[in-house]
Amino acid sequence: MVLAASVAQEVANVPFAHEVAGLVQPVAEAQNVLGLIPMSHGLILAGILFAIGLCGVMVRRNFLFMLMSLEIMMNAAALAFVVAGSRWVDPDGQIMFIFILTLAAAEAAIGLAILLRFYHQRGHLDVDSANEMKG
């Protein structure tokens, strides 16, 4: 207890200590604002986005729309990680978001390359004729 009091006294004696204390206040206010939005709202939004993406993958037969729906699903999962990470004030959610964002970019690049190849071969983007592709 004495150590904590001496550290607090030393911090108070540091020049510009009031400016450092002024920088801490906006961070605390930002964390309070995050507490105003319930976690359930963010997770419900992520679930709705995931369901929309899943319906798009299952219903649409166009390869481009299926790729876009898959991106929506990945963004919904990333949103769920960010919401959960902000709820528990843990940076792991944001780290997973960056990982998912990188994975989505790689998936989009490979998917678009396959899409272009498929379109040049077939002249359309209907996925039902994909089983006729040859090596």
Swiss-Prot record:
The keyword Translocase applies. The chain crosses the membrane at residues 33-53, 63-83, 95-115. One of its GO terms (cellular component) is plasma membrane. It holds the Pfam family Oxidored_q2. Keywords: Cell inner membrane, Cell membrane, Membrane, NAD, Quinone, Translocase, Transmembrane, Transmembrane helix, Transport, Ubiquinone. GO terms for biological process: ATP synthesis coupled electron transport. It catalyses: a quinone + NADH + 5 H(+)(in) = a quinol + NAD(+) + 4 H(+)(out). GO terms for molecular function: NADH:ubiquinone reductase (non-electrogenic) activity; quinone binding. It comes from the Bacteria. It is an enzyme of class 7 (translocase). The keyword Nucleotide-binding does not apply. Coiled coil: none annotated. NDH-1 shuttles electrons from NADH, via FMN and iron-sulfur (Fe-S) centers, to quinones in the respiratory chain. The immediate electron acceptor for the enzyme in this species is believed to be ubiquinone. Couples the redox reaction to proton translocation (for every two electrons transferred, four hydrogen ions are translocated across the cytoplasmic membrane), and thus conserves the redox energy in a proton gradient. HAMAP family: NDH1_NuoK. NDH-1 is composed of 14 different subunits. Subunits NuoA, H, J, K, L, M, N constitute the membrane sector of the complex. This is NADH-quinone oxidoreductase subunit K. It comes from Psychrobacter arcticus (strain DSM 17307 / VKM B-2377 / 273-4). The lineage of its organism: Bacteria, Pseudomonadati, Pseudomonadota, Gammaproteobacteria, Moraxellales. The gene is nuoK.
